[in-house]
Amino acid sequence: MTIQHKQDLAQIRAMVPEMRRVKSIHFIGIGGAGMSGIAEVLLNEGYQITGSDIAENAVTERLAQKGAKVYIGHQATNVAEASVVVVSTAINEANPEVKAAREARIPVVRRAEMLAELMRFRHGIAVAGTHGKTTTTALVTQIYSEAGLDPTFVNGGLVKSAGTNARLGSSRILIAEADESDASFLHLQPMVCIVTNIEADHMDTYGGDFETLKQTFIDFLHNLPFYGQAIVCIDDPVIRELIPRISRQVITYGFSEDADVRIENYRQEGQQGKFTVVRKDCEALDITLNIPGRHNALNAAAAIAVATEDEIGDDAILAAMVGTQGTGRRFEHLGEFETGNGNVMLVDDYGHHPTEVDVTIQAARNGWQEKRLVMIFQPHRYSRTRDLYDDFANVLEQVDVLVMLDVYAAGEKAIAGADSRSLCRTIRSRGKIDPIFVADTQQLPEVLANILQEGDLLLAQGAGDIGKVARQLAALELNISNMKAK
């Protein structure tokens, strides 16, 4: 470590002076997107980082290469040297490392509490909402980076232009995705908040009461100082309803006529969206956004609203929009492959809520109108499938061919009537399409060999391990003849 690097670390750590007492930080579930980002930033700040997870992945390998000690499997001995233990939302009190930390009186904090410490003495920009958080966080980061402001960022997904989901910057700016799934975003004390939209999701956290969820978002916005800014999407009916209850400066964005930052003349040309952004007391911006879909135009407008309020130059905004490479697993183009049945385009997308799936379908339809849309869908969680069952059926019947995998349980027990077979039967009974249920992903090559045609757009959709499946298909280059042989 050079003298200059030591001085830089000292300056950064001086932002949180009381954290100097902390030497070693242990992350349970370190391989998750949200956890790994915080771990990487703290590692780069000079803290000793250890962590555990149930399996190796690319994230744990990268952290290990950077100097973290990563344990595969959870054991009480893993926390022996820890000053503090950070847990993800998926970790409960029965975890042996949590139990050992409690017994040793080692502080156990949630992910958002540690993120709040990173944000406490920085200029925090927090991005919340049911959908679009990861992409919006990446777009804000890209603009500030283009402007030479070198922000720290912690995102819930890969920022492709940076090659990572988190990075320690040299400025006081911290841009972070704020997670409402367990209400832990209430720990954050940002200077600027973005709320992209509010829908009924993660309702177990909120006792099944949508009013409680809405009030929690209001409470989140009221964590802003009195001089802070709430950047909200006025197109969302719930947000529009809540605006009179927000006692902070509100800046709106959207397609609506009364938006402070307004999108006009949107059109999609393949992978790119093109539109004009109209701002009060500023020149209009003609945007070329290098990711498709009206929903991404909204995400871009949120980022532009933040940057405009921070007086970032238009050149940086325009360069960030056209230069963005998007985020991992958000309409990610994995390639076009010449198969035994013809040329097929493969796209991978993380969307797992009906609204997210719907906007992905619309982006595919608008950008590639001549293509037949074949979707491999993996429902995520039985509880979400149960709660949004009819919405899923309504959205999924829009594709031309639907292949459905088993529900990715994410630790949940099966719920009768909320499984993939039931959902397939419901969609089939409506008469528009005939879904194909695939119980074992090993059967996918044979199924695809029988259904793919020249010019198809194959969309792998969901938040479980469907992303790995998509990459396996890409590695095979969708070679249907080889698939049939196997």
UniProtKB/Swiss-Prot annotation:
Entry EC no(s): 6.3.2.8
Parts forming coiled coils: none
Gene3D superfamilies per the UniProt record, alphabetical: Mur ligase, C-terminal domain, Mur-like, catalytic domain, NAD(P)-binding Rossmann-like Domain
GO molecular function, one term: ATP binding
Annotated Gene Ontology cellular component terms: cytoplasm
Major subcellular location class: cytoplasm
Subcellular localization: Cytoplasm
Catalytic activity: UDP-N-acetyl-alpha-D-muramate + L-alanine + ATP = UDP-N-acetyl-alpha-D-muramoyl-L-alanine + ADP + phosphate + H(+)
Family: Belongs to the MurCDEF family.
Protein name: UDP-N-acetylmuramate--L-alanine ligase
Organism whose genome encodes this protein: Vibrio vulnificus (strain CMCP6)
Taxonomic path: Bacteria, Pseudomonadati, Pseudomonadota, Gammaproteobacteria, Vibrionales
